[in-house]
């Protein structure tokens, strides 16, 4: 396996997540968030010659990290199309799936992507820069009520209405284009002592809306349930409560949209067995080495 990579993204909860997959030598696995390839490399280390790994990523930058290995296939796509591409590759069942839902550190640190309030650049925030609305597009076109809903749902903010109103007023004067433009609008609404936390919530809400992240996560989980063989495992690393609640609920019930089945006693009839009833978090040592692992939570389930 060629281990060259254009950047050194540190994979979070690497051992814990791949251990959780219980990789079998000849199995078929999917890393739906390939990114820098860290988790994929570890899965390949544990796969035998007859096993295969599919790596999904919609970000064109991730293609620079593809390694040469006949056991690996890269799929340039959002993971919400998991079932479509597995069918295209004639894969009917998989033995395991891993997802690390965090935004790569290389993206946070790239001022041209607009993911972070720490770097001044254009407000883009798209994972796939070839299509879709940018963060600036949303701020300049969404109605005030739609902006309120976005900040309420995805940022869990208490002052969503005030922020949304200020955005609408500001864009009447001039178009919002850069991170600095946005920060200037937000300044009166961020309390001293909680600046970073509140800005992180606001930027999170905008990023989730730009990339339709929660909708994509739901779709991927539903498809993963259908693809996993009995005994196959799914390991998901989340970074905020919205994602974690979705994953926890899905592992418990196996559904989002359908009627949730219960037994005679009212217990959920889930297609999954929970492997770790307590979420797995990064050790103190890992947090020191990689501070962005601090908020990571790992949940693992096995298809019954």
Swiss-Prot record:
Alphabetized SUPFAM superfamilies for the sequence: Putative methyltransferase TM0872, insert domain, S-adenosyl-L-methionine-dependent methyltransferases
Keyword presence, Mitochondrion: no
Free-text function comment from the UniProt entry: Specifically methylates the N4 position of cytidine in position 1402 (C1402) of 16S rRNA.
Main subcellular location: cytoplasm
HAMAP family documented for this protein: 16SrRNA_methyltr_H
Residues that bind S-adenosyl-L-methionine: 37-39, 57, 85, 100, 107
Catalyzed reactions: cytidine(1402) in 16S rRNA + S-adenosyl-L-methionine = N(4)-methylcytidine(1402) in 16S rRNA + S-adenosyl-L-homocysteine + H(+)
Species assigned in the record: Azobacteroides pseudotrichonymphae genomovar. CFP2
Lineage of the organism: Bacteria, Pseudomonadati, Bacteroidota, Bacteroidia, Bacteroidales
Keywords: Cytoplasm, Methyltransferase, rRNA processing, S-adenosyl-L-methionine, Transferase
Any Pfam family: Methyltransf_5
Location within or outside the cell: Cytoplasm
Enzyme Commission (EC) number: 2.1.1.199
The UniProt record lists the keyword Cell membrane: no
Protein name: Ribosomal RNA small subunit methyltransferase H
Cellular component terms (Gene Ontology): cytoplasm
Any one biological process term the GO annotation gives: rRNA base methylation
């Amino acid at each position: 396996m060629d281990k060259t990579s254009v950047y050194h993204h540190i994979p979070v909860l690497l051992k814990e997540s791949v251990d959780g997959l219980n990789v079998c030598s000849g199995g078929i696995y999917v890393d739906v968030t390939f990114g820098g390839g860290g988790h994929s490399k570890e899965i390949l280390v544990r796969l035998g010659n007859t096993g295969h790994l599919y790596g999904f990523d919609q970000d064109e930058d991730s293609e620079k990290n593809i390694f040469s290995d006949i056991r690996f296939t890269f799929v340039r796509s959002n993971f919400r199309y998991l079932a479509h591409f597995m069918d295209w590759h004639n894969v009917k069942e998989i033995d395991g799936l891993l997802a690390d839902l965090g935004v790569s550190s290389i993206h946070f640190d790239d001022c041209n992507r607009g993911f972070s309030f720490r770097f001044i650049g254009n407000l883009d925030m798209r994972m796939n820069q070839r299509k879709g609305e940018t963060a600036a597009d949303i701020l300049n076109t969404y109605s005030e009520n739609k902006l309120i809903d976005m900040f309420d749902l995805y940022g869990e903010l208490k002052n969503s209405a005030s922020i949304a109103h200020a955005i609408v007023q500001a864009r009447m004067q001039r178009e919002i284009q850069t991170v600095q433009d946005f920060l200037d609008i937000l300044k009166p609404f961020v309390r001293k002592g909680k600046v970073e936390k509140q800005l992180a919530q606001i930027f999170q809400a905008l990023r989730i809306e730009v990339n339709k992240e929660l909708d994509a996560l739901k779709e991927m989980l539903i498809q993963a349930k259908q693809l996993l063989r009995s005994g196959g495992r799914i390991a998901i690393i989340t970074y905020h409560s919205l994602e974690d609640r979705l994953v926890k609920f899905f592992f418990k019930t196996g559904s989002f949209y359908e009627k949730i089945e219960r037994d005679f006693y009212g217990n959920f009839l889930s297609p999954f067995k929970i492997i770790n009833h307590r979420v797995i978090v990064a050790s103190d040592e890992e947090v020191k080495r990689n501070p962005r692992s601090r908020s990571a939570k790992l949940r693992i389930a096995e298809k019954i």
